[in-house]
Amino acid sequence: MVVAYKHEPFTDFSVEANKLAFEEGLKKVESYLGQDYPLIIGGEKITTEDKIVSVNPANKEELVGRVSKASRELAEKAMQVADATFQTWRKSKPEMRADILFRAAAIVRRRKHEFSAILVKEAGKPWNEADADTAEAIDFMEYYARQMLKLKDGMPVESRPIEYNRFSYIPLGVGVIISPWNFPFAIMAGMTTAAVVSGNTVLLKPASTTPVVAAKFMEVLEEAGLPAGVVNFVPGNGSEVGDYLVDHPRTRFVSFTGSRDVGIRIYERAAKVNPGQIWLKRVIAEMGGKDTIVVDKEADLELAAKSIVASAFGFSGQKCSACSRAVIHEDVYDHVLNRAVELTKELTVGNPDAKDINMGPVNDQAAFDKVMSYVAIGKEEGKIVSGGEGDDSKGWFIQPTIVADVAEDARLMKEEIFGPVVAFCKAKDFDHALAIANNTEYGLTGAVLSNNRDHIEKAREDFHVGNLYFNRGCTGAIVGYQPFGGFNMSGTDSKAGGPDYLALHMQAKTTSETL
């Protein structure tokens, strides 16, 4: 009997024992910084001369690790291994696959602060953000294991007296997992284990700026008893290895989290039927957002300001769910804006090794340059009332930036920035606010701050996003509680951490026996 699922609790770092335990995790990670990590294909550890170099975005001089880089030849070898392994893995008992996830979750739970410390070093996450990332990785494994146990016997269908009918789920085949750098543990682990527990084999290509945490997760899967060849670790260039695997005729599905442009490119390439291919590939994609917090005139204005600041600047705004637009009723606009500026100026920005840092760096030089270019656009399209400065001398740091008085059709209101920049826009009334919120090609998350029940119900029906929150921020979905995924250009409408997510990695088979 499996106990009911509950999400992994977040660590309270105001408790001295927890603070000391996290500091020990940092020391442990510091003891192995700069190590080399191999590719893993069929259990074989392969070292290549060509390496992906991972550095600390808060301290560019600090080497986190060097990970061997796959070539097309090694990617082909991994595909052949995954394809062969699938023939046995697909017949493994769902209970056994679920047990491996439970064991992996237990291992990560024991090493929780170590994994979070890796995220501090490799992704530049403050303690609370790193802790939440690790907790979510645990949640995905615990939740998907239980979901597989629910789905293992299929779904009931009708049978006449003369027959016995069954509706079962069977795995798809070899999946290519292309995971993101912003949640390099949680999303990577969730995408991988969802595919594996469903009976598929996997080629895992992690983001090139955060491959070390993925290499460490491979150690966990091996310790948990996952057979060799089920997950094959093939870090590499997207243009070389990624394209090759997406195009490969033996690839059955691609699971991707990342930018809109790359997601569209994968979707287009996967749609093409290549020589030797006998199926239509499935694509599971989550591709970002342009997320809005709407503040009604009948709202808790202090809660509104706090929700905007937390959602805009948590992990430096580098969440696909981050608030990049605050649309506020004109009657309360000045009050909410001024309070948000006050709260933003209280935030501490720096190296997240320290406990009390609210905001760390952005991901890399490319991210820094992109965000600063939007800050420059903000100076033209609105008024910068907080932040606006960046410093890339030691790490890639950008001050949390509020741009006020932005027109609803401005670039800052349309284009995904993926950094600590939020645009404030006035709305004439609630209907106007919803119209502005929906005026985007994305549809991932949103929030409405209102004490008007009619307005809440109107937003519930008309605010077109996959995850809509009321009287709170627009980030922080919890596995199994708020299944996550959006509409339109935010992806393929999949819901990670939800009851139908595993079914995306399987196909239904009907059998009918005449009695």
From Swiss-Prot:
One of its GO terms (biological process) is glutamate biosynthetic process. The active site is at E286, C320. CDD domains: ALDH_PutA-P5CDH-RocA (cd07124). GO terms for cellular component: cytoplasmic side of plasma membrane. Its EC number is 1.2.1.88. GO terms for molecular function: 1-pyrroline-5-carboxylate dehydrogenase activity. Coiled coil: none annotated. SUPFAM superfamilies: ALDH-like (SSF53720). Pathway: Amino-acid degradation; L-proline degradation into L-glutamate; L-glutamate from L-proline: step 2/2. It is an enzyme of class 1 (oxidoreductase). Pfam families: Aldedh. It comes from the Bacteria. Keywords: NAD, Oxidoreductase. It catalyses: L-glutamate 5-semialdehyde + NAD(+) + H2O = L-glutamate + NADH + 2 H(+). Belongs to the aldehyde dehydrogenase family. RocA subfamily. This is 1-pyrroline-5-carboxylate dehydrogenase.
